[in-house]
């Protein structure tokens, strides 16, 4: 079946009797969404433990907050490095192999962190090596989580793409909420089996990520391979790698804007979020208040994503991305002017999470729709790599900027990053993609 002609770029596509409506495909998509959601919940719990308990373990092993931060950054770096290879693997062998391998590698990372916790008091060199390896390879779990949202669109009907992608984003909520709170139950588990207290959360993480791997291995039929049997690709089209595919995507207005929008939103979100606890601590906020603020921020990021997906399918991708940009601007204004008011800081962080979601869901869908079927998987991997690089830049740059220009200045600079994407939004509304895949 050939690819459909595009509607006006960025608007919600109209329903048509495409192959995605065939009963067998609908059943396969339903199964795919269930399995992807289950893997997101299970794997997310393990990855969430690394986000919070991991930095504590890193501080314990390295005995230096600076080196602990470097070790923690390895997770983001590896997530960026493996995004493209995982996408290439998916294009050749399907999502089942790609995502299954990623979660399996993340499982080995958690095992290494258990060993690092056990050796922290007796062999610091080996413990540090295992720590960096474990935190780094855990980044494959982050990459798998991001690429799972694209897997949800492989068999999705055009008019349902955003809402089905958003379900996978929403499933991440469970892991990001439960994972960071594994400290107490993890210590209790470690005590019961004779391990170091810090090893306990990673025993739980190992089990959860191993289960996520098993769930992904049940992904039959593979959604990407099944989609390939219906999507006609020009046999004379030149075979090319990710760089060429990204180059072609960059020449398409919608794809270019979607990529820039996701990277800008991710940079702003990570940069402001990373320094918010430091700002709150400077103004005397308790650890409980800081934790509550971050939890509310995470709630804004993920909890409303199904509503965002429904709205993007109904009203179009570009209007929702524009709304997300406006929400991010409001977030930087509220947080930047909050000063010592922890209530306003929390409100700003909540808006920051909502704005990120309003950009990520429709922009991911727009990127998928704007490129050809032949390039789609590689472009998706390239976009995830770019997002993780953006996260690393946001996290690394926010600390020095906080010291130089303060929290208000950091938010003002973040607002400028959002505004820089406006010209691309205007141009994307005038341009049409080369072809919108069905």
Can you annotate each of these PLM segments?
Residues 82-95, 303-317, 402:
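Helix-to-loop junctions at the C-terminal end of transmembrane segments
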Residues 134-171:
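Cytoplasmic helix-loop-helix junction between adjacent transmembrane helices
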